[in-house]
Amino acid sequence: MYLKRKIDDYLNDWKRSDDRMPLIIKGARQTGKTESILHFAAENYKNIIYINFALEAKYKTILSGGYDVASILKNITLIDPNKNFIPGETILIFDELQECPDIATSLKSFCIDGDYDVICSGSLLGLNYKKIHSNSVGYKKDYEMHSMDFEEFLWAKGYSETHIKDMLQ
């Protein structure tokens, strides 16, 4: 069962944005980053490419041909020929960014290319920006996700917006 989170509205606004850039979602472990991203992707995209660098170390080589979109997509396809990329309908989700921090360097290329939406997720624990070749400043957005707050807890318990508003006054 999916629990509504505040990031849901942020992700929907990001998707509707005309100047949508790749997104990095950071936060402590076990806060629901991956679950929220995958739920959003399933609701909004026909094609989801999900790569978890911690569980699938073989994907750490996708930058071997450079940081350009064509090289990265080619390398992903060489690892798994069943992964298809449909411009305008595909989202790439790079999870556990701290295991392959240089993927952040490629975000500039994805932003300029514009054919694919990209969300990266990573734990603040172990994400060392000093190890990143180039951080794609100006070509990405950052969002920090926190543990469920009281309002989100009330949503999960089934309280209506009216009841929550009354309680929080």
What are these regions (language model features)?
Residues 1-169:
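Phosphate-binding site recognition
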